[in-house]
């Protein structure tokens, strides 16, 4: 039998010249790209958070590289990052053999990178992509998704419940105090203010207890009820006020993550429409690179567009010339802002697709299909009756935006043979409300969306931000935040967005090198072919 030969294997061998750890990192490995890019970024804002003195600190650039590369490789846990610094050669090389523990990594991520400091890093990388011609920043494809908070789904506080319970408790306390005042024959017992406030109840409670202690009271049960008001009810009112202060304009929040709002998520395993604490994440993309991001508490998208566009301007100093978004952003207020600031809105509105259908276009009873005399301000119904301008109304949205609508009414529809097809109201004449300003914005948006460039943007939109969200959520497993508060979750989403951009950039560089190598090979083949001939 032939002897089997094995390669030399000795774990206890010493090397005369130990290899450099960089020798184990391939030249075209993504970790080298991350290292090269982050080496050229300005991190002075992060360095400003260090006070100096005391023991030596881990270098912020090293910690930044480790965390960014960890997110690029789908590692989101600080403990796992610390473990890889001892086990993985790429992390060892990137950290220069430094081994910060998970507390140092987590503290750097949640504190040093917060308050806009990481946004500065992200902005510099976007500028790099722009300088290389990968993005122009002239167009933004905008979309949003909801990401769950780390908070438990059963930690909710609802504004409606708080207000209702507070009102009930105020009335209950007022009743107890009135009974006590009557028992003590107080002169001002019937002269209480119409609006009951916690401060008034506090003063009345202290006064009643003081008088009871001074004069004595036969009804011990009443004395106990007033004491309970001071010990339990008034602190409970303070708790309700604290809830309302945290809620602000929101309808809900989570006790374990007060910045998170309860929202309906796309992933609903029980299929019962249950709300969960989360954040509405907004991104804008170009060529599938994320160029801007932000987090909002509003579950709907239309209220986030204006602050999101303003955040882009604050970072880059200008507005993009073209904005592309779906119908969730197509409100009158948003159109007005975009047109006023020189942006071209390729933004759908909620009736856009319905208006394109034959059934809609062939329906003469719809306001959009009726003849409108702009000079004399009246509509003409299918039977030829004039619908005159009879009133004006003003509505205020939850964002404080004021819309003006005009009411148009027919003179008499009681004997109209088309009434059953026209409307089903009980009144003898049809009325309709028209927002002319909103209609003009929608008409302009429709013309843009149906143009050649609009069709191009509409076909690109589903493969721009939606593809980024799908890649991040399903290919890289980021579906839930690990940190609490808007301040920290914004850093976390920024890291996810930067990792997404770097993955694309690494792939682009690899593809460019491959094409360059193929071109050089073709050039080298041509002289050889000529000499052979």
Task: Report the location of each language-model feature.
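Anion-binding and metal-coordination hotspots
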Residues: 8, 67, 74-87, 98-533
